[in-house]
């Protein structure tokens, strides 16, 4: 079984609203990227399950990803967004989990920390404790989209909410030039492996790389992540459905799988099967 833990799907008006959800996020889609387009992509490439992730440009209304997961319950689960600055976000999180069937949420510390360094630490805000406890009470999963410099927030949250499963999105964006410093800027991310409730998505390697396949300048840090977290806590994810992959400068799904199978040749067959 192959599971893609990270694909964005969306609709546009009049089917679903569009609009930014966070500071420094202003992109607006001009065309849809549907669940059906993703299903065709999955079927053509042997992918069994996908986690649908609400985009940052689809407002706080998670209806499309929630409905898609309920429409195709044997192929999808949904991760939603909830506003970390909304005083009613605990009730909102409960609604999306209890009434609409989403299994988790995505937060973007990188979009907030650029303004007020303290106020921007959304995973550490006392005002969000009830929301995170609400998600924890429901065995929710939370994925964190951020840079390595914000790893301290996840370190705090993973300790404070040990019953939440936390996922690191896109490896927290390691940069190949860090290799000259023995990858030391990435040490705070690797240190998160001390938390048994933190997992890491091995994804977006190609966009960080300055080299063509097999993206050799990124393979050492992938190895370090695998060694730190262990094969039981690494996940595989991609980004967009169908032709939207190349439109957003991502490789096709077949190439994503080739990276996982051929470029990551340091993984055993069993380890690779576990990641996928």
Stretches with model-predicted labels:
Residues 1-2, 90-100, 152-159, 184-194, ...:
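Short amphipathic alpha-helices and their capping/turn segments at secondary-structure boundaries
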Residues 1-60:
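An N-terminally biased module of ancient metal coordination in phosphate/nucleic-acid-related enzymes
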Residues 3-7, 50-53, 77-80, 103-107, ...:
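Hydrophobic faces of well-ordered beta-strands that scaffold small-molecule active sites
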Residues 8, 56, 147, 172, ...:
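Catalytic metal-binding/acid-base residues of hydrolase active sites
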Residues 31-42, 86-97, 184-185:
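Short, acidic/polar
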Residues 59-149, 156, 199-205, 212:
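Active-site gating/metal-coordination segments in enzymes
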Residues 60-75, 158-167, 220-227, 251-263:
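Short, electropositive alpha-helical surface patch
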Residues 175-276:
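H/E-rich (His + Asp/Glu) clusters that bind or coordinate divalent metals
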């Amino acid at each position: 079984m192959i599971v893609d833990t990270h694909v964005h799907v969306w609709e546009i008006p009049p089917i679903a609203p569009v609009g930014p959800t966070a500071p420094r996020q202003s992109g607006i889609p001009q065309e849809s990227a549907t669940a059906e387009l993703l299903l065709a992509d999955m079927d053509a490439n042997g992918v069994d399950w996908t986690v649908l992730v609400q985009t940052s440009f689809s407002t706080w209304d998670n209806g499309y990803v929630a409905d898609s997961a309920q429409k195709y319950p044997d192929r999808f689960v949904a991760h939603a967004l909830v506003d970390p600055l909304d005083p009613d976000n605990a009730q909102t999180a409960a609604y999306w989990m209890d009434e609409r069937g989403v299994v988790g949420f995505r937060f973007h510390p990188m979009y907030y920390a650029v303004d007020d360094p303290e106020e921007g630490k959304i995973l550490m805000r006392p005002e969000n404790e009830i929301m995170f406890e609400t998600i924890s009470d429901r065995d929710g999963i939370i994925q964190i989209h951020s840079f390595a410099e914000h790893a301290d927030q996840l370190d705090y949250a993973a300790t404070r909410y040990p019953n939440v499963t936390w996922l690191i999105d896109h490896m927290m964006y390691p940069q190949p030039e860090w290799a000259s410093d023995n990858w030391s800027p990435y040490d705070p991310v690797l240190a998160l492996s001390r938390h048994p409730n933190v997992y890491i998505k091995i994804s977006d390697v190609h966009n960080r790389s300055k080299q063509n396949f097999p993206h050799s300048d990124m393979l050492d840090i992938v190895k370090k992540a695998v060694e730190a977290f262990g094969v039981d806590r690494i996940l595989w994810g991609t980004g967009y459905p169908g032709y939207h992959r190349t439109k957003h400068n991502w490789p096709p799904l077949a190439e994503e799988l080739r990276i996982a199978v051929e470029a990551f040749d340091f993984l055993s067959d069993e380890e690779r099967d576990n990641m996928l």
